[in-house]
């Protein structure tokens, strides 16, 4: 049973998120590390944009052919999601968007809400695809679970005075990068039977 759940069987489609997740992981990690060394001043905001755009662009060029190849599968999945019942679309949208919207309203909880948005969003998408389309995106489930666990990690580190609150967003981005990296590696390594 364990293997049947975590390895896609013949009746289920496989996930092709691996390269996309690895791309996201490397881009977020690189941009986060480089941004860390730039002084945090509002007048340098454009530099942050250049760093993030540059990191995503560089890794896109590195993985270009594989990303373009996997976009066909992703486009097919998006088409399948258009036939979901309206209630499921709303639930999925709320899972993705609500934490990010709250992050704008409650900046002091931004790092938790980023992780919650990615966690709830990936978990809800996994569940809905599994129920409606028989697609096992275990890599999405992995990303979601790691992001949710990461909220606890940050709380533990704050309470234990291991890190200061000012490093929370940096740590959240690193943990997001790790989550997508693990999900991407899982997807790239685990193949259907």
Enumerate the language-model features and the residues they cover.
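C-terminal ends of transmembrane helices
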Residues: 60-79, 126-133, 184-193
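Selected alpha-helical membrane-embedding segments in polytopic membrane proteins
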Residues: 22-105
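Terminal transmembrane helical module of multi-pass membrane proteins
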Residues: 128-193
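Alpha-helical transmembrane segments and their membrane-interface exit regions
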Residues: 53-60, 116-128, 175-187
């Amino acid at each position: 049973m364990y293997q049947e759940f975590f390895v896609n069987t013949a009746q289920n489609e496989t996930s092709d998120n691996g390269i996309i997740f690895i791309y996201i992981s490397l881009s977020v990690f690189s941009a986060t590390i480089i941004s860390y060394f730039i002084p945090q001043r509002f007048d340098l905001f454009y530099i942050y944009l250049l760093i993030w755009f540059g990191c995503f662009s560089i890794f896109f060029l590195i993985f270009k052919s594989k990303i373009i190849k996997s976009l066909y599968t992703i486009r097919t999945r998006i088409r399948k999601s258009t036939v979901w019942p309206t209630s499921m679309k709303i639930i999925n949208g709320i899972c993705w968007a609500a934490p990010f919207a709250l992050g704008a309203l409650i900046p002091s909880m931004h790092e938790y809400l980023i992780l919650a948005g990615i966690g709830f969003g990936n978990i809800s998408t996994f569940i809905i695809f599994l129920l409606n389309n028989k697609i096992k995106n275990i890599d999405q489930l992995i990303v979601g679970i790691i992001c949710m666990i990461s909220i606890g990690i940050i709380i533990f580190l704050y309470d234990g005075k291991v890190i200061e609150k000012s490093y929370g967003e940096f740590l959240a981005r690193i943990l997001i990068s790790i989550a997508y990296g693990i999900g991407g590696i899982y997807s790239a390594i685990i193949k259907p039977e």
